[in-house]
Regions:
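Short cysteine clusters
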Residues: 42-45
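Extracytoplasmic electron-transfer domains, predominantly the class I c-type cytochrome c fold
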Residues: 35, 53-118
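Sec-dependent signal peptide recognition
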Residues: 2-7
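Beta->alpha turn/N-cap motifs
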Residues: 48-49
């Protein structure tokens, strides 16, 4: 009788994880990604869940990114492609208004973890 109770308790506690941690399967530190999104000024053009910023948006809102089938108009939506887009959007779409901001690989991974988990 004790085992089912302990198993139930373990399952309940497993669901009480850190909301800033990237979901299973994603690399990176989502909490650091939220900070990096603010530091790189992404909020100047985008509405981002959990990141305060401008009310004038040039780029698309960055909410529910994980539900989008594609990113940047052509890429299958996965973390690797999102990191590529964040780091060098001009290489993917030379006509994009999104600038190359010199985002490091580590920061792009963390930023993608935040975006794909919120």
């Amino acid at each position: 009788m004790k085992r089912p109770v302990l198993l139930l308790a373990a399952l309940v506690l497993a669901g009480c994880g850190d909301a800033n941690r990237a979901p299973v399967g994603l690399q990176g530190d989502a909490a650091r990604g939220r900070i990096a999104l603010a530091q790189y000024g992404c909020r100047a053009c985008h509405m981002i869940p959990g990141v305060t910023g401008s009310k004038v948006y040039v780029g698309r809102p960055l909410e529910e990114m994980a539900k989008r089938p594609i990113i940047a108009g052509t890429l299958p939506n996965n973390q690797a492609n999102l990191v590529r887009w964040i780091r060098d959007p001009q290489a993917i779409d030379p006509k994009t208004a999104m600038p190359v901001l010199g985002v490091s690989e580590r920061d792009a991974i963390d930023m993608s973890a935040w975006l794909l988990s919120h």
